[in-house]
Every structure is written in C-alpha cells, then in structure tokens.
C-alpha cells in the first residue's frame, strides 16, 4: 500500500499568537482480543474476578513455564487485519520487550517488533459534515498485557493483581494522518465499530478493553513534522479529544515563547484539563528487543487466512453502502444506523417489508432519542423491532398521525403492549371523516375572525389554524384532509 500525504486543511488549523499551526496526530490503539483464554496460557480472561484469581503459572512467570500460543488469538488478529484491508503476513515473530515493573512478572513483555502479524491497511472515516478521509494503518501486532498495580489500598504498601497479565492485546498503529481532535475521535469510533462487527474486541473502554496512546505534534503549515509527545493510556473517546486539544495548545505556547518541545510520554488529567510529564519518551533501543527464544516463528497457511476471510461479516462500510442503495437512505442516516452492529440489525428488522426511509426516520428520531435520554441502547430497549414496525405501519396506513405516533410510542415504551390493540383501546385512530373535520374548522374560523383576515393577507399563518384544529381534535385529524379543508374555507 502506498503512503499518502494529506494536504493542509485551512479549516483545521489552530490559531496561535504568531500565526496558524497544524496539529499532527497518530494513534496506537491497544485492543484486548476477545478470547476465553490468554495469549500464551489457558487462564481465563473474564473481567472483574477476585485479584489474582485468573493467573496461571505461565502468567506468574514461574521458573520453567513455557508459553504456548493461543490459536484463537491468532485468528482474531488475522480477522482484524482483514477487516482493516491490511496485508496479512504469513510469517511473523515474537520478541521480548525488556523493562522492569512490579506488574510485569517476567521482566519483559512478549510482543512483535520486527515482524508483525499484520502489515499496512487503512480505515475510511466519515465526519458528521459528510467529509470522508483515509487513515493509514502502519501495522497490527500481538502482545501481552501487563498486570495491574494498586496503590490506594494502603498508605505504605502497593499491591499487584495479575488477572490481566498475559491477556492478548492487538496494538493497532496508525500513520500520523489525523489533523484535529474531531478526526481522532471519529477514527477511534470507526475503528471500535469495525472491531465490534468482527467480534475481535468488545471495545468497552470503561473496562480497559480499548486504550489509546495518542501521539501529538504541531508544526507550521507545510513544514516538516514537529517533535511528538505521547499521551499514554487515554481511556475514553471524549478524553482523547480533550487531551489532544490541551496538548496541542501547550506545545504551541512553548514554541511561540521560543522554547523547544521535549520528546516525552505524558498523562492526561481530565479533572485539571491538562497533560503532565510522566517520563522521557523511550526509543526502541531502550527496550533491548530480541527474538523470544521460547517461541518459534508464527507461520500461517494461506488456506487458514482464506477460510477466515470467507466467514467475515458484512462490515460498516459495506453495510452503509447497502442501506443507501436498498433503502434509499441518506449517507448521514445510514452512518448513524451502521455505527453499531446491534443498531443496524435492529433497524433491518424494523425495515423488513416496509418503507426503509420511514423506518429509519422513526428509529433515529423517536427510538434513539428516547433511548439516549434514558441511557439505554437497542439491546436494553423496552420496545422490540416488531413493535416499532407496527407503529411505522400504522402511520403509513393512515390509521394514526405522526403526532399520535409519538404518543403511542411513549405508551409502548413505558407500558408495553401491541400498538394496534392500543390504538383501538385508547381511541387513537386519526379522524378521516371530512364532516367532523369541517365542523372543527368552522368553529375555529368563527371564533377567530381577526386571524382569518391575517391569514388571507399572510398565508404562512395557516400553521396557526392547523395547530388549533389539531389541538381541538386531540391530534387525531388527518393532516392532509385538514390542510385541504382549511385552505378551501379560508380561500388561500
């Protein structure tokens, strides 16, 4: 895959005291592999167990214990590489990354330095304004996670929990192709969506399933790359955006004051809204990488890769294109619906056999709006796809108006029930009897002669009469019939 260079976008430049600056961002995403067992042992990867409950002798680095590769972790890495349109390397190797820390019992981390399992790929990212851009993927490699040091249980002691030690991670390294905090957030959101579609990572940042190291530098437009600082272990998409903004501003202020940027690793403090120095940024030679003598090169057969490829699910980009073609959706609506696999599946159940646009409008505007208000998603939704589909059908058949549909949806959401039965039981059918509608209109016209004169001079005031008639009919008047009668009676 050929490298590409993004042209400077004037809209994304940051204004400094002495002129404009361009921020350049690269990401290293640590995605926990969805697997029942760890990368080199059979210990469980279950989240939330008692401390040191999921630790094998291999994880604890007991003498004489040798690592054995977990085939499912390898398969998950290959699936991810295929989903990123990346090169799958049939031969890769494991290396020891040497550093000392209490929660790293081996004294080194098994990783892939020289020969990763996945090479160059790409992610296509869509922004809310309709802009799309490509983020190049430099590599994906497998590595072990470390344990967890706990410092707040005692004023004098630190504790180590090795439950996470040895859990398989995929480190997905992007090229420095991002040019704003908005782009970085959109990239991580899209990457997480791809991983979830593939089933290779849960992407739950609250549980540490997905963590980001964010590399930030600034430069004058058109100049060479500046010195980068790495912001370590950012654990939410919102914090990623905030960390980039404050770090870019920090670097700009230093450079404009005549200072220089030190290449270092920093931490983001969301409470103070600042980054602070953690340590000088290590280079590869600081880790003294060398091939792990306990692990043979990982050699894959092409048939193995092809078998995995043949069973890949439909991914967000392909699903979005299909939704646009098959259901006539706008690119924006299609993007919203395919952002999560569960959401896309829910929509397709609603849209099956009926107007796709009408289904999308109701799902996005009514269902998602209500779920977001309550902090729920389609998995925990109290309204089933069949119930939403029934409401969409009732609107399409002219049985209820769009306004009544909102009220009906609220009843189904809070109380449950069959929408068609509820319409009958609660008298929610819209009034299509033109005689009844004319009676309501006549009463409103008779009571408001001043408004009649105004609407005849200014036809846009018709909406006031529509609102009064809808109010008088309890929202049940057929909108088209009502509009026709009003225009005829008012002579407009």
UniProtKB/Swiss-Prot annotation:
It catalyses: L-glutamyl-tRNA(Gln) + L-glutamine + ATP + H2O = L-glutaminyl-tRNA(Gln) + L-glutamate + ADP + phosphate + H(+); L-aspartyl-tRNA(Asn) + L-glutamine + ATP + H2O = L-asparaginyl-tRNA(Asn) + L-glutamate + ADP + phosphate + 2 H(+). GO terms for biological process: glutaminyl-tRNAGln biosynthesis via transamidation; translation. Its EC number is 6.3.5.-. The keyword Ligase applies. SUPFAM superfamilies: GatB/YqeY motif, Glutamine synthetase/guanido kinase. Pfam families: GatB_N (PF02934), GatB_Yqey (PF02637). It is an enzyme of class 6 (ligase). Keywords: ATP-binding, Ligase, Nucleotide-binding, Protein biosynthesis. It comes from the Bacteria. InterPro entries: Asn/Gln-tRNA_amidoTrfase_suB/E (IPR017959), Asn/Gln-tRNA_Trfase_suB/E_cat (IPR006075), Asn/Gln_amidotransferase (IPR018027), Asn/Gln_tRNA_amidoTrase-B-like (IPR003789), GatB (IPR004413), GatB_C_1 (IPR042114), GatB_Yqey_C_2 (IPR023168), Gln-tRNA_amidoTrfase_suB_CS (IPR017958). One of its GO terms (molecular function) is ATP binding. Heterotrimer of A, B and C subunits. Belongs to the GatB/GatE family. GatB subfamily. Allows the formation of correctly charged Asn-tRNA(Asn) or Gln-tRNA(Gln) through the transamidation of misacylated Asp-tRNA(Asn) or Glu-tRNA(Gln) in organisms which lack either or both of asparaginyl-tRNA or glutaminyl-tRNA synthetases. The reaction takes place in the presence of glutamine and ATP through an activated phospho-Asp-tRNA(Asn) or phospho-Glu-tRNA(Gln). This is Aspartyl/glutamyl-tRNA(Asn/Gln) amidotransferase subunit B. It comes from Azorhizobium caulinodans (strain ATCC 43989 / DSM 5975 / JCM 20966 / LMG 6465 / NBRC 14845 / NCIMB 13405 / ORS 571). The lineage of its organism: Bacteria, Pseudomonadati, Pseudomonadota, Alphaproteobacteria, Hyphomicrobiales. The gene is gatB.
């Amino acid at each position: 895959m050929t490298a590409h260079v993004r042209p400077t976008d004037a809209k994304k430049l940051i204004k400094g005291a002495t002129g404009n600056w361009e921020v350049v961002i690269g990401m290293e995403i640590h995605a926990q592999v969805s697997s029942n067992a760890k990368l080199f042992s059979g210990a469980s990867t279950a989240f939330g167990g008692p401390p040191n409950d999921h630790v094998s002798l291999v994880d604890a680095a007991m003498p004489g214990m040798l690592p054995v590769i977990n085939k499912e972790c390898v398969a998950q890495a290959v699936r991810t590489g295929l989903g990123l349109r990346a090169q799958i390397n049939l031969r890769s190797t494991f290396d020891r990354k040497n550093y000392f820390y209490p929660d790293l019992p081996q004294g080194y981390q098994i990783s892939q330095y020289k020969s990763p399992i996945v090479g160059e790929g790409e992610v296509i990212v869509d922004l809310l304004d309709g802009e799309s851009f490509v983020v190049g993927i430099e590599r994906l490699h497998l590595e072990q996670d470390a344990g967890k040091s706990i410092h707040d249980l005692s004023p004098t002691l630190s504790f180590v929990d090795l439950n996470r030690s040895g859990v398989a991670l995929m480190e997905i390294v992007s090229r420095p192709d991002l040019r704003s905090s908005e782009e970085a957030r959109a990239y991580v959101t899209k990457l997480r969506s791809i991983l979830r579609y593939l089933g290779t990572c849960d992407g739950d940042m609250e549980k540490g399933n997905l963590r980001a190291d964010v590399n930030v530098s600034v430069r004058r437009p058109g100049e060479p790359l500046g010195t980068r600082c790495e912001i370590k272990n950012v654990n939410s998409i919102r914090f990623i955006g905030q960390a980039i903004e404050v770090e870019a501003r920090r670097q700009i202020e230093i450079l404009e004051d005549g200072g220089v940027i030190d290449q270092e690793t920093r931490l983001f403090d969301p409470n103070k809204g600042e980054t602070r120095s953690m340590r000088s940024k290590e280079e590869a030679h600081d880790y003294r990488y060398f091939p792990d003598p306990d692990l043979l090169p990982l050699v894959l057969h092409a048939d193995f890769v092809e078998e995995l490829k043949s069973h890949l699910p439909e991914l967000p980009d392909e699903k979005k294109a299909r939704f646009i073609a098959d259901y006539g959706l706008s690119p924006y609506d299609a993007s919203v619906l395919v952002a999560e696999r569960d959401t896309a599946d829910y929509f397709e159940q609603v849209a099956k056999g009926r107007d796709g646009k009408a289904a999308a409008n109701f799902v996005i505007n009514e269902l998602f709006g209500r779920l977001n208000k309550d902090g729920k998603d389609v998995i925990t939704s109290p309204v089933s796809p069949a119930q939403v589909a029934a409401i969409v059908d009732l609107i399409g058949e002219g049985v209820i108006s769009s306004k009544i549909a909102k009220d009906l949806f609220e009843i189904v959401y809070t109380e449950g029930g069959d929408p068609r039965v509820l319409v009958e039981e609660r008298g929610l059918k819209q009034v299509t009897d033109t005689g009844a509608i004319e009676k309501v209109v006549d009463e409103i016209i008779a009571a408001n002669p001043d408004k009649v004169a105004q609407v005849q001079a200014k036809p846009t005031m018709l909406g006031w009469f529509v609102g009064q008639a809808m109010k008088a009919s309890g929202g049940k008047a057929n909108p088209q019939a009502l509009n026709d009668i009003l225009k005829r009676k008012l002579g407009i």
